């Protein structure tokens, strides 16, 4: 696989599933001006209790020649649900096992009682247990042909109609879509395409504009670099210089063996191509650390300390060091991400994130609809220079899957930046999150709202409340609940008028 497309693909796999320089909303500067939601006070860890259920879905919602169906998995929790004045909070599943996303979306559980909400977590087709063709689902592009955002949204639509029809008391209840990362994109698009089924959507860390020249391709890597620059003196500069240090050592007679031993690699480097793979892996590691730069210990992609970027930067205080020292510093920094638990005996360049993410499914989506360009120049960012090469990317996709990407289809389907006719969507983005560069970070209308979260990483607002949360994310969650309650109020006003 080509260099630029491999890096993009690795980034997208870590996605899941965004502008650091944007001004902070005045409301975020005055947290005392908004009543705090009682849902976010310090509380003991909640035990998640849900039922696992399945619904038969059509493999193809839009054609009439295929009658095949499959079982879509979904989770449902109704502990706090009330028929009178209640709500349905519907999580639009990402590119992975839905139980994993359920366990990492504590915000919904935190507000369930206050919102009198039934919680529904819908698994995305081709991920987790929701496989349209079972073991053959990833065998070729013919079986993968039904892995599209449109088909996934149709699954969600049918599931909502089914729940309202079969659960007593749910028929006239409003539904709010929620999601983070790719799931956040789906939540926003779901509100756009099915406004009669959901009264609003919370799209957290949803880079809906990371497509087809809607934003510069280098914005992602620039934000990663800013995170590291702000987290330690000389940190980003040291990383920028580290690539040449690796290259110089690799060219020496015993360089590959020395690098393998110094970095404690599980699989030794044996050829020059392995060096590029090593650097790709290291690059993705720094990206992932920036994404999950949470203010407390976490275990989202990997077990990590609080503020992991700052911890990593402790090993990059000095940029003018011998190459061997630089590589030893790289090893110590990599250990923060891959061996915080202290149990790893070696570092595996094939490992970057949790196995709960669906690698095969996402690589196909990245080769069809979800074409999200990234590039770097090595000057305004800390990575090696790599341009975006659409032809190379397309050729790699064709070689792997036998398909050609359609980079303009998502903007065509969902409107690109021309979305002002839609309503009731909250776009929340953390300033630390690289994906914020492709997200909506300024209000579009009075009902298409943007919240930029200072000191916030990838969909931090969707995570469970924590005593170490910055005030900015506490306020963000209260704002989100405030807007959702307004949508509910407006919904019941319209319902009474109809009756």
Swiss-Prot record:
UniProt keywords, alphabetically: Carboxypeptidase, Disulfide bond, Glycoprotein, Hydrolase, Lysosome, Protease, Signal, Zymogen
Catalysis: reaction(s): Cleavage of a -Pro-|-Xaa bond to release a C-terminal amino acid
InterPro entries from the UniProt entry: AB_hydrolase_fold, Peptidase_S28, Ser_carbopepase_S28_SKS
Region (SKS domain): 196-337
Matches recorded under Pfam families: Peptidase_S28
Main enzyme class: hydrolase
Protein family membership: Belongs to the peptidase S28 family.
Protein name, entry field: Lysosomal Pro-X carboxypeptidase
Origin species: Bos taurus
